[in-house]
Amino acid sequence: MRVKTVFFDVGNTLFYASPSRNEIWLEFLATTGFQVQPSILKQALNEADALYEAKLYDYVGQMEKLWALYDSMIFRKLGITDRDGTLVREVNKWWDQPKWYRLYPETRETLQAVKNRGYKLGIISNNNDDLLKQLKSLELSEYFDSITYSQEARANKPEPAIFQLALKRAECSPNDAVHVGDNYEKDILGARRIGILPVLVDRDDRHSDADCLRIRDLRELEACAMRLKSDGFAPREMKD
């Protein structure tokens, strides 16, 4: 196996949200004078998520409009009146702050090391247009030769279509690619289904019996970078 392209998931693989989404919302509501029970907020978010999933593909390039619908629904479910849209605008600004997204300590050095070995790097993410802003704010855009996300692909991992679009953009065949991600069903099974070699990022050691290559830290991928090009992955070295 001669690997040419290494694809990465983003959320909980390269970076993570901190604090949690619910906590970020609760903090915003508190700063604007609203006290909401976490369980009630959770229910409102779940209902708004259903709207988001149903409308996502209709709002390519128009995420501000979709988020306005999404946030308005949350406020309605919480019984909060926002007649002139001020709260919607404020919560969008709140979420645009880079501080909510944090890189794992080894992310940047690993991407640079793998890129230095001559591999093309790509992203395959269940995400929307906002991903491009997140990558830019985290100064990650420069590392990637291609970026593919579900809103524009009109498909979510583990569906084959999003992987196929990523391969097309990278001008790469499945046999020449690796996909690194933290979600077994979406990343591992999705990649394997079309012939891409998957690698599971298992930071919390929850999948010790996984039937795939498994790493606990992106640095383990860096250590195998030379083998990626010359011999492919060596399972005995990558697993326990």
Name each model-derived stretch.
Residues 1-6, 16-17, 30, 35, ...:
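Asp-based, Mg2+/Mn2+-dependent phosphohydrolase catalytic module
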Residues 2-109, 117:
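N-terminal helical cap/lid subdomain that shapes the substrate entry/recognition surface
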